[in-house]
Amino acid sequence: MRSKLSILSLITLIVFVIAGCSNDVTEKEGKEGKIVLSPKSDDIKGKVLFDSAHGQTAGSADWVINGGFSDFADALTKENYEVTDLGYNQLLNYDKMKDYEVVVIPEANNPLKASEQDAIEQYVKSGGSILMISDHYNADRNFNRYDSSEVMNGYRRGAFDNPTKGMNAEESSSDKMKDVQSRDFLNEVFGLRFRYNALGNIKVDDLADEKDSFGITKGVKAVSMHAGSTIAITDPDKAKGVAFVPKLSKDDAWNHAVDQGIYNGGGRNEGPYIAVSKVSKGKGAFIGDSSMVEDKSPKYKREDNGETKKTYDGFKEEDNQKMIMQIVDWLNKKDDDQDLSTMNVHLDDKTNLLNFEQPENSRENEKEPWGTPKQGYKWYDSSTYA
């Protein structure tokens, strides 16, 4: 299958050249290796690294720069950003990230190792910027019990004391689970957490004004959510919201929510849909739904059964593209402030959390994983992928 993918990548490159594509693809080795998309201009605005090593193509996901995130990648290169894919079998470390202004982690399905969390923290505190794009709770795409919000937060819901809870011996001892430790990571480093709520189809038009959003919301009227989550602000000196869902009722919850789905009745009490953070020399931005970024050009077949994926044109909806690009522009700029308290912006209140949102009190509401994978498929062993 990998050789077929390489041939398809070559064909795609030839088509781009014949069509006069606005990007020069300087290297394109497919899923297993590094992909670099360079703008034609020599005046590179910044360098952006995309993580693809944490299950970004699991299940129906295809969140890679030559697939379901290609519209995003193309928009970046048109704005003179150089865009690079980390590589399918790579781990995040400081040396890999340090030469990039922005690192994007799209809806990760495999957990970050403790060493990767440490590297992200070092990278940001040294002046780098991170963009994390999550999804609703129970979006486990490869049946490994981890949702993207759990991966990014740093712990599994209901398994804070044991990240391998419920796994068999082969899973728990696999390379994917080595050095995986529970940590309240986003809260400790960035002053926020992805909530484990699950909201349905929402038009998000309650936006922080341009001044209080560092220009991120300039010209933006609304962005969209199609089954997503919000973010809890735990330290207002570090983190603040820039886009908020409207007031909601129980009918606005995602149909497959494992609990009430909506925690604080929506509105600003629910926590922001999109948040930013200022940490030492660096920055972070966080989005509660991958639907806002995806496009309808998936590259790969499903890893569990080989079927064709279907993705959607979320990047083109509402003002999603404008908002996302302005997020990257803000992340690309350096600021000397150590946190938000000195940046002359309105600071948010802390989000009121439910008791079960404390990591040690969290619970697994339904049996996990939510489904049974095709016989022979093992999320932790790529040799079993279709």
Predicted regions: what they are:
Residues M1-I7:
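Positively charged n-region of N-terminal signal peptides that target proteins for export
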Residues I14, L192, S290-V293:
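Short loop/turn segments at secondary-structure transitions that flank enzyme active sites
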